[in-house]
Amino acid sequence: MSLSALETTLNTAFDARDSITAATKGEVRDAVELALDLLDKGEARVAEPQADGAWKINQWLKKAVLISFRLNDMAPIPGGPGGAQWWDKVPSKLENYSEQKFREAGFRAVPGAIVRRSAFIAKNVVLMPSFVNLGAYVDEATMIDTWSTVGSCAQIGKHVHISGGVGIGGVLEPLQAGPVIIEDNCFIGARSEVAEGVIVRKGAVLSMGVFIGASTRIIDRATGEVYIGEVPAYSVVVPGSMPGKPLPDGSPGPSLYCAVIVKRVDEKTRSKTSINELLRE
């Protein structure tokens, strides 16, 4: 089946999703299985980079993931500590992986790493005990550190470091919402959170504890320029606050959280400078 035919089939099936159950067979099930397999192998992805720097969102692949929840019944999933099982609709990506298949895949999965089927993990990725949700894409030579979460359909670029305890938000619904995108060569500091379709552009550095959602103000302190929903390339970002409105009695109001761009570096400087040096003021 061609990709255009697959897209048409899945769009039609999604419009009639209320009629789809675990008993559904035939074209719809085959189309969903094919789409999930393409996602799992990295041969298709929910968001694709374009030559002009924009990202194309393939909503039909998100629809395939959503339809799969209606097609699949709950079932035991083995692999829990002490022989325990989980109870879910989505099998593990790593279920039945042999030594040969791990060697061919070329990534490391430390005990405690959980990856759901339809997430793609590229070569030379290191997965510490972490969670990668369905439909996500993790590109080459990236580190997903301990207790980090890569949400559904999130896109993580090459040579990215997702530090310990980071949350990368997922998105399946609403359909029109775009996924979180972390472009190549980014560093996301420990316990930071990037959610609600935010794009972190190439080479950006987020310090520890930076929280960015769709409405978070990202302020360049050198220019006063305000960004929302996107961290500019090669920015170095730290947590900050901005003055709030005065209270009714005229006294100062509470400050509001924001993220602050403290400096920008070029690609050459970024590649030669340690993260600690970039963040040191």
UniProtKB/Swiss-Prot annotation:
Transmembrane segments: none annotated. Signal peptide: none annotated. It catalyses: (S)-2,3,4,5-tetrahydrodipicolinate + succinyl-CoA + H2O = (S)-2-succinylamino-6-oxoheptanedioate + CoA. It is found in: Cytoplasm. Its EC number is 2.3.1.117. GO terms for biological process: diaminopimelate biosynthetic process; lysine biosynthetic process via diaminopimelate. One of its GO terms (molecular function) is 2,3,4,5-tetrahydropyridine-2,6-dicarboxylate N-succinyltransferase activity. Keywords: Acyltransferase, Amino-acid biosynthesis, Cytoplasm, Diaminopimelate biosynthesis, Lysine biosynthesis, Repeat, Transferase. The keyword Acyltransferase applies. InterPro entries: DapD_Trfase_Hexpep_rpt_fam (IPR005664), Hexapep (IPR001451), THP_succinylTrfase_dom1 (IPR023180), THP_succinylTrfase_N_sf (IPR037133), Trimer_LpxA-like_sf (IPR011004). It holds the Pfam family THDPS_N_2. SUPFAM superfamilies: Trimeric LpxA-like enzymes. One of its GO terms (cellular component) is cytoplasm. Pathway: Amino-acid biosynthesis; L-lysine biosynthesis via DAP pathway; LL-2,6-diaminopimelate from (S)-tetrahydrodipicolinate (succinylase route): step 1/3. Belongs to the transferase hexapeptide repeat family. This is 2,3,4,5-tetrahydropyridine-2,6-dicarboxylate N-succinyltransferase. It comes from Afipia carboxidovorans (strain ATCC 49405 / DSM 1227 / KCTC 32145 / OM5).
